[in-house]
Amino acid sequence: MDVGTVLAPAYDPLMRLCGWTRAQRSVLSASQGSVLDVGCGPARLADAVPGTYVGVDLRLAMLTRAHGPHLVCADAAALPFPNRTFDTVVSTAFLGLLSPDRRHPILCEMARVCTHRIRILEPVSPLSTARRALTLSRQPIDIDELCDAGWHVRSVGPRVYAGAYTLVTAEPQAQSR
């Protein structure tokens, strides 16, 4: 059993208590149309999306705590959607938990299913040791990783949540040409 499954019952109340939910919603500030939330956990963003929301998480224990009609238990490295399905693809505090080799196929999939905008709120390099401890990150994301996965990065920043997480906005490279 993995840590996410064990923590599922306490995860959402703890995140609300520490103010993470408010920080997390910053990824939606420029979203439009349909939104895919990769690594959605208990789908805290679902009620803040005016259009169609689809949440994907591999952990059924997290999804059973979520509310919303469009929740999918699936591996983010093999998203079960056709190319260019979603207007906006978001992810918060998920990618930084993975090693770069595990992240790469997920980043590629996020670009594949997106038509317009990708927004992530994740620990981004460089990150001080103290801030890295706040994120529980295995390794902060490097902007070059995003570009290598087919993203055209439009903006990096601001840092939020004690400066430990950075909002990154990108487009799939096919669209940015």
Describe the role of every protein-language-model region:
Residues 90:
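A conserved beta-strand element that flanks and buttresses the S-adenosyl-L-methionine
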